[in-house]
Amino acid sequence: MAKLKILVIGKRNGILQWYENILDSNDQSADYVISGFALNHNNTLERFLKKIIPNKDVYTAKLLEKKLYSFQPDLILIVDLFYFSPSLIKVLSKYPCKKAHWIGDFFDQRLAKSKEIIDLFCFTDSSFMEDAKKIGITNSLYLPLAYNPNIFFEGNESKAERLLFIGAWSPNRQELIEQIPLPLTIYGKGWDKLKKADSIIHPYNIPLTQVANLYRKHKYILNLINKKNIRQGMNMRCFEAPACGCILVSEYVEDLELVFKIDEEIIYFSNPQELKSKLKETIINARLAKDKVHYHHTYKNRLKTLVELLLDSKISQ
């Protein structure tokens, strides 16, 4: 039987590298093959041309149509929040394959413009499904983020007890970190704004491979919600940290309970004082969360879910 074809449409070199992580889940043993199309640019020539041509949307739509014609996908998976131009919607509507749009940010009414061509909207925050209903989108699914096991895995390094946070600066994150009565090590662009005693601050972004290396050297990984993007969902850190054998120390959000046994597998807190006491008193077996994400929360798992939901008839042929 010929393998199914999945075309992933996304953005190259995004901060989260969501697009690249899904492409990296291509596996010779899987029932499908994956190819990618980046809406921003797929090579240096495209990148240059998009800086000088008068209508980038029309140019991108023509490139996408060429890719669809040559690859002939069974499933198109759009990752990240995109509001499609009329040119792109027209091209996507020509192809009868199944289409899913996986979204991890707050959205507005513009998303509804593509509802006639999308078979399934997937949201990383469970509350987004209600937001979608308000703009007429009912074909939706809660599909949390995941992690890339080729990058995030446990090593043999000894783990420091110091609390580590790696992530972008935001006002609500700074407000919370200022109140945490513990020294931290922090990496991320914008954190030069923070002045915190006994803390080590590296105010710049680092590549995912370095993030994973740091996780392997720390026991406790702090997770703070960026409220500019989500309401109660989980970010990639919720899966990447346990995958490295760390204990996830997360600000409480409701979606944590959809994945973890929060009293046994992670440390959660509702305020900074509770965080300090739980770090002292709570006994967590890091292997419980590590095994859970390993078996159930990779990008390969997410693709399997979508293939089973949208291409079940083709699998059984």
Language-model-detected regions and their locations in the chain:
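A charged, aromatic-enriched C-terminal amphipathic alpha-helix characteristic of glycosyltransferases
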Residues: K280-L310
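Active-site donor-binding loop signature of nucleotide-sugar glycosyltransferases
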Residues: G104, L145, A168, S270-N271
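Nucleotide-sugar donor-binding catalytic core of glycosyltransferases
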Residues: A2-L63, K67, V79-S87, R110, ...
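Proline-aspartate-enriched helix->loop->beta-strand connector
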Residues: Q72-D74
